[in-house]
Structures are given as C-alpha cells and as structure tokens.
C-alpha cells in the first residue's frame, strides 16, 4: 500500500502552473486528481478562453486497459451535445501521454454549497434543481448513456442553472445489454434520490437521532416522500424517467 502511494506521489505529480501543452493550452491550476485522471483549469492562449483539461495519470497510461477506458470517455463526450453538460473541445497525445479538453463550467458544486457555505434549499428549490437534473438524465438515458457517478461534487450550479460534470465512470450501452441497462439505470435513479435528500436536509434544524431515518427527521409532503421512496428503492422502483417526471411534477405542485 505504501509503495503504491509512493509511486503515485512520484509519477502522478500534477503539471506545473504555466506549462503550455500542444502549443495552445496553458495550465493555470490543478483542480483535482481522480481514480485515473488529473484535471486542470487551463487557458487556450490562442482564443483566450478558459477550458478544463484532463490528463490520464502517468501510472495508468502504461496500462492498455486504462488507455482504452480514457479513449472511451473521449468518444462518449464527443457524442454528447447538451447545454448543461460540458462540451468536448480537443484531444491530443504528447510523448505517449493522452489529454483531452472540454468546456469550463463556471459556478459552485452542490457539495460546496451544502457543506461549506451551508446554503439552505427550500423544498421547492430542491425539487426544481432535481427537475433540471432529471432533464439531463432523460437526455442521457434516451441515448443509453448512464453517468454512474451523480454526486453533489459533480453537479454545478450557476445562477440557478444546473450542469452535470465528470463522465469518467459513464458508459454508453447497446440495446442488447438489457441487464446492465437495468442496473445502471437504477444506479442513476438512486443517485438522483440521494441528491434530493441532501438538498432537503439543508433546511433541517432538528437534532439528528442516533438511529433516526430521513422519514422520521424530515417533514415532507406525501408526494415528495413517495418520490424519494421510489428513487431510493424503498418502494417500487421507477423503470423509466417518464414516471419520475410525473411524480416529480406532483411533488412540485404539493409544495407550491
């Protein structure tokens, strides 16, 4: 374990600020390191435009499986054209190291808003944000694309507009892969419910019970409760986004 960590520190060190890649993209700062990629904020020095650049980690670049996975992510992003998903811009290889560039989305992610800024969201605000997120999921699922990592750090809000980022675990399936479609669909639905739960808890002022559940702690309308129960698999799971949309609309009506 210690040797593995040492290798990461030695070989997966982020690029230095100011480095220019492909004679075009200047590294401004490292935004983070994921399971197999390093993510940077960069500037296109030709267009003077900020972008996000992703690099396959050097320790992963030596493995064919990881290189294929990185190329699959690029291929997937090229097929996605949605205003609330960062668009693909460019790709290149330097000294055997793969990179790709995508749009930079301004704003703050929900994790920052909830846990660092302690921003409260009313039931209506929470449901309206989930409505936007569902629209993105509808777009993806219609194309048999499953995000598989819908979490608060991967959801950015800018002036009330929601965007979904980080498609590192996403996968596009074929109609024949019915079992995997079912599993991945439910994973996205569960993540949607969990995100809603986080948002609803932002206004919770009571003292959390040691073994208390959200059903005991939160005061919700029956429509919102049903929506959450089905998304989280407590009651009959949703099979399609259309059914979620129907119940979500009822939930919104119940709090307005």
Swiss-Prot record:
InterPro entries named among the record's database cross-references: Kinase-like_dom_sf (IPR011009), Prot_kinase_dom (IPR000719), Protein_kinase_ATP_BS (IPR017441)
PROSITE patterns assigned to the protein according to its UniProt record, in alphabetical order: PROTEIN_KINASE_ATP, PROTEIN_KINASE_DOM
Stored Gene3D superfamilies: Phosphorylase Kinase, domain 1, Transferase(Phosphotransferase) domain 1
Ranges where the Protein kinase domain occurs: 25-256
Keyword DNA-binding: no
Highest taxon, organism lineage: Bacteria
GO molecular function: ATP binding; protein serine kinase activity; protein serine/threonine kinase activity
Chain coiled-coil ranges: none
Keyword tags: ATP-binding, Kinase, Nucleotide-binding, Serine/threonine-protein kinase, Transferase
Reaction(s) catalysed by this chain's protein: L-seryl-[protein] + ATP = O-phospho-L-seryl-[protein] + ADP + H(+); L-threonyl-[protein] + ATP = O-phospho-L-threonyl-[protein] + ADP + H(+)
EC id: 2.7.11.1
SUPFAM superfamilies: Protein kinase-like (PK-like) (SSF56112)
First and last residue of the signal peptide: none
Similarity comment: family membership: Belongs to the protein kinase superfamily. Ser/Thr protein kinase family.
Protein name: Probable serine/threonine-protein kinase YbdM
Organism: Bacillus subtilis (strain 168)
Protein encoded by which gene: ybdM
């Amino acid at each position: 374990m210690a040797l593995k960590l040492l290798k990461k520190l030695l070989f997966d060190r982020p690029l230095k600020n100011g480095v220019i890649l492909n004679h075009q993209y200047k590294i401004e700062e490292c935004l983070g390191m994921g399971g197999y990629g390093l993510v940077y904020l960069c500037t296109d020095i030709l267009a003077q435009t900020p972008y996000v650049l992703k690099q396959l980690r050097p320790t992963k670049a030596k493995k064919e499986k990881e290189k294929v996975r990185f190329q699959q992510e690029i291929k997937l992003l090229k097929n996605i054209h949605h205003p609330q998903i960062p668009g693909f811009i460019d790709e290149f290889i330097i000294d055997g190291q793969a990179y790709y560039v995508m749009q930079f989305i301004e704003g703050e992610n929900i994790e920052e808003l909830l846990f660092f800024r302690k921003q409260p969201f009313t039931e209506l605000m929470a449901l309206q944000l989930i409505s936007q997120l569902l629209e993105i999921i509808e777009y993806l699922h219609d194309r048999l694309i499953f995000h598989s990592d819908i979490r608060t750090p991967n959801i950015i809000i800018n002036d009330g507009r929601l965007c979904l980022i980080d498609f590192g675990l996403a996968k596009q399936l074929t109609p024949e892969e019915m079992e995997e479609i079912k599993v991945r669909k439910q994973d996205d639905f569960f993540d949607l419910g969990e995100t809603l739960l986080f948002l609803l808890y932002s206004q919770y002022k009571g003292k959390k019970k040691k073994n208390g559940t959200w059903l005991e702690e939160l005061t919700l309308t029956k429509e919102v409760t049903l929506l959450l129960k089905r998304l989280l698999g407590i009651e009959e799971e949703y099979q399609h986004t259309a059914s979620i949309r129907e119940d979500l609309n009822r939930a919104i009506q119940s709090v307005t």
